[in-house]
Amino acid sequence: GCGNTSIPNPSTMHIGIDRAGTVTLYSGALDIGQGTNTTLVQCAADALGLEMSRFRLVWGDTALTADAGKTSASRQAYISGNAVKLAGEDLRRQIIRLANVGETAAIEFGDGRLVVRDGDAVREIDLAALAPVRFDDVLVGEGMFDPPTTALDADGQGKPYGTYGFAAQMAEIEVDIELGTIKVLRVVAAHDVGKSINPIQVEGQIHGGIAQGMGMALMEEYIP
């Protein structure tokens, strides 16, 4: 809302690998049903070039996770998603540098080691030989994303938010003018979502918005 206008709105994420080869995404983002946990693991897997099943997720534990800000208005997908992407890219750069291979190299996991393949070249990183740098993790990538904004000037012009949502909704209803009852016959929702990370979750979010809108309009006696 207006309280966020032109102020910092960052999220910080960490991805770590321990000596056993466990890959952990540390997320302070709160999933309240919108599917953030799945979406952020998708972002991490894409950034590192790994399968989603490789990741362990630690979330909602303030002793282990950095601040990711509040969960509202699809904020976590945009802001924390970018933070996870940066963390994954940071970790991948560290692995590539240790293995002394090219940027397109593939990362695989052996028994307590990383196997990095770059064409015919194969390098191994012994994880047990590395010292922990954060908790039990011997390799850690960090990403912080804060949407670029500018303060409003005296004329109210500027860029107070990093991105915006665009949508249109139409509802066809039936009204019993004698009883005063309303029946929703059909709702059409059109949303410009940009690049969809998880299309099924996006559709679920739209359905949820429709349900909330119907509730506010018909049942909550809301007076704006």
Give the ranges of each region predicted by the language model:
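Cofactor-binding beta-sheet edge motifs in enzyme active sites
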Residues: 1-224
